[in-house]
């Protein structure tokens, strides 16, 4: 089966549109979203509505989805950065009742998909924890048994592989990263962020994966950054949330 893997859209409507438009040239059978549909940018309900319209679709929750929908409150919100907190509070006010309910009922990862791979927002051991390094990945590999897990949260496109003795880290460099997955290795794969890339490349990032051929691709797509920046500023959200999009940080 051919999968479209999205993560960390963060209410960036222009980026989401660019990604979905680009996938018209890439055949896929099922879409996966690794969470953080909202937060940071201003196209809140438009983004949730568009995601919900995709069929077939499997979605798990992210930390921003939890906070903005009220699943987690002030204690979790206090751990956000100042700008993220401001955006989360604004987002919570803007969500429609239907979309707030939708976000609040999203399942927690890790979750198996078609017996082919697992999905999680952050670490499979803790949905709010980041996987940045080979040591972070090693802890997960030693504590789990899935062959492949797609993760998000860090906004950094990267592949960690483990052959049972050593973890290798491969940064997914633009414009397209391709990897034939080895059946004798295990993988943690981050497709990067649709809406707020942080690898110093402003291009929107997502993945496609063919479970039959075991071919992984991480794609980069240009989008109208200025349009997203304008909507963020027009909403009265913090300027750094707009400015960072130009540099992919």
PLM regions and their residue ranges:
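Active-site environment of divalent metal-dependent phosphoester hydrolases
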Residues: 10-15, 39-41, 64-69, 111-112, ...
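Acidic, His/Gly-rich catalytic cores of divalent-metal-dependent hydrolytic chemistry
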Residues: 164-249
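Conserved beta-strand scaffold positions in the cores of enzyme catalytic domains, especially
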Residues: 5, 59, 149, 188-190, ...
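Short, conserved loop/helix-junction motifs that constitute active-site signature segments
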Residues: 52-54, 141-143, 181-182, 209
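Active-site-proximal beta-strand elements of phosphoester/diester hydrolases
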Residues: 2-10, 116-123, 188-192
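Short, well-ordered secondary-structure micro-motifs
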Residues: 70-72, 130, 160-163, 229-231
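His/acidic metal-ligating clusters that form di-metal
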Residues: 26-27, 93-162, 249
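Core catalytic region of metal-dependent phosphoesterases/phosphodiesterases
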Residues: 2-100, 104
């Amino acid at each position: 089966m051919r999968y479209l893997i999205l993560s960390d859209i963060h209410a960036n409507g222009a980026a989401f549109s660019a990604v979905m438009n680009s996938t018209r040239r890439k055949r896929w059978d099922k879409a996966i979203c690794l969470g953080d549909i909202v937060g940071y940018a201003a196209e809140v309900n438009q983004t949730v509505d568009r995601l919900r319209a995709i069929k077939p679709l499997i979605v798990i929750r992210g930390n921003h989805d939890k906070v903005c929908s009220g699943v987690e409150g002030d204690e979790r919100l206090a751990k956000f950065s100042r700008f993220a907190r401001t955006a989360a509070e604004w987002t919570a006010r803007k969500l429609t009742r239907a979309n707030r309910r939708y976000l609040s009922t999203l399942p927690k990862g890790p979750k198996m998909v078609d017996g082919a791979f697992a999905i999680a927002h952050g670490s499979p051991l803790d949905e709010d924890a980041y996987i940045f390094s080979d040591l972070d990945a090693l802890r997960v590999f030693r504590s789990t048994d899935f062959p492949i897990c797609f993760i998000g949260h860090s906004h950094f496109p990267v592949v960690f592989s483990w052959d049972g003795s050593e973890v290798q880290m491969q940064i997914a460099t633009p414009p397209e990263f391709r990897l034939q997955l080895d059946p004798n290795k295990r993988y943690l794969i981050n497709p990067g962020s649709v809406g707020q890339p942080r690898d110093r490349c402003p291009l929107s990032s997502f993945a496609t994966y063919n479970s039959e051929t075991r071919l992984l691709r991480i794609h980069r797509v240009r989008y109208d950054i200025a349009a997203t920046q304008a909507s963020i500023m027009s909403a009265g959200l913090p300027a750094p949330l707009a400015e960072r999009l130009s540099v992919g940080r």
